[in-house]
Amino acid sequence: SLTHRKFGGSGGSPFSGLSSIAVRSGSYLDXIIIDGVHHGGSGGNLSPTFTFGSGEYISNMTIRSGDYIDNISFETNMGRRFGPYGGSGGSANTLSNVKVIQINGSAGDYLDSLDIYYEQY
């Protein structure tokens, strides 16, 4: 069954999607680029773009967050890894043995929140 968990704060403008991901980060996440669309600010360093293969999905994900998204990392069902990108602030939350269906969120000058839609295994 599909469920979701929201991390981070209440600011920013909403977005959603999921076929490729990149981030801009320094001590926290300035922006997330999903399917080539930039959500957030222009600070920080740009990560390589992670493009999902056929049948590939996020199976384990760790997000550090407080009022903003501080750090993100994930591993796919095919063993490929992304991150960690960002800093050590906020509290860590891990989603394990999941199939991430969609990533929604909100962003302004920084990445305010992520709302992860997933199936639990």
UniProtKB/Swiss-Prot annotation:
Keywords: Lectin, Mannose-binding. Residues 1-120 form the Jacalin-type lectin domain. It holds the Pfam family Jacalin. InterPro entries: Jacalin-like_lectin_dom (IPR001229), Jacalin-like_lectin_dom_sf (IPR036404). It comes from the Eukaryota. GO terms for molecular function: carbohydrate binding; D-glucose binding; D-mannose binding; identical protein binding; N-acetylgalactosamine binding. The keyword Oxidoreductase does not apply. SMART domains: Jacalin. The keyword DNA damage does not apply. Gene3D superfamilies: Jacalin-like lectin domain (2.100.10.30). Mixed specificity lectin with anti-HIV activity. Binds to HIV envelope glycoproteins, including exterior membrane glycoprotein gp120, and inhibits viral entry into cells. Binding to gp120 is dependent on gp120 being glycosylated, and is inhibited by mannose, glucose and N-acetylglucosamine. Belongs to the jacalin lectin family. This is Griffithsin. It comes from Griffithsia sp. (strain Q66D336).
